[in-house]
Amino acid sequence: MAFQAQDLDMIGKKDLLKVNGGVSAQTVFYSAQGLPARRDPFYWVVNANLTLNFMGISAPFSASFSSQESQFAQPFNQYGISPKYKAITAHIGWRSLNYSELTMAGMQFLGAGVEVEPKDIPIYVSALYGRFTKAIDPLNIPETAGSMPAYERWGMAAKIGYKPKFGQLNLTMFRGFENPASVTYTDPSLEVTPGANLTIGVNGKVKITRTTNLKFEYAHSIYTHNLNLEPSALDDFTYADNLGSLIPANA
């Protein structure tokens, strides 16, 4: 279920109440030959949406329900809300934000975020924190999920942007990390270890003509394969040792 942006600043400027929506349903038949079945041979999915607009406050609701929910390794039924007041938009619950293609590229997360975009100045900021995937314990994997064991994954991201008339410039950062304590046991042969990643990027565009824009993007990523290893110095990449708690450096 999802609640999208509601502009509280528009109260009294619209009709009192407007309602619209729709419902759709589908059934799926599944079969596999030569490999184990990854789901039931028959399942259904129902999608519904309802939009309420009360005195300028828009509250779009959407929901997806499936007979497979109890067998998915990751959540299928999800919900969230994104209320908006003037230049500030808050995001709570299951949300998806897109900062850039190389850092925070529209990944869904369960948590909280905020966007601030004033109308009178060309600067805007955004930040988020939340859980991106829940843990999949190797001792409790659904038989039809077709999933590998995985650690619980959390992340935080931030963006600051400048948008003059001739273009746009964004500085972005994403830090993701997996919780080593979220999985009780892993088979060494699977090579599943808790990792961490830090990505810092810059992107933007420059207006060349009325119909032509030059877009650019650059990002640099540092990845720690196993958080269970002891920290160590990296002589060839000394800048990584100065990033503090953002990314642990080890062999």
Describe the role of every protein-language-model region:
Residues 1-7:
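Bacterial Sec-dependent N-terminal signal peptides
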Residues 7-251:
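Outer-membrane beta-barrel channel domains
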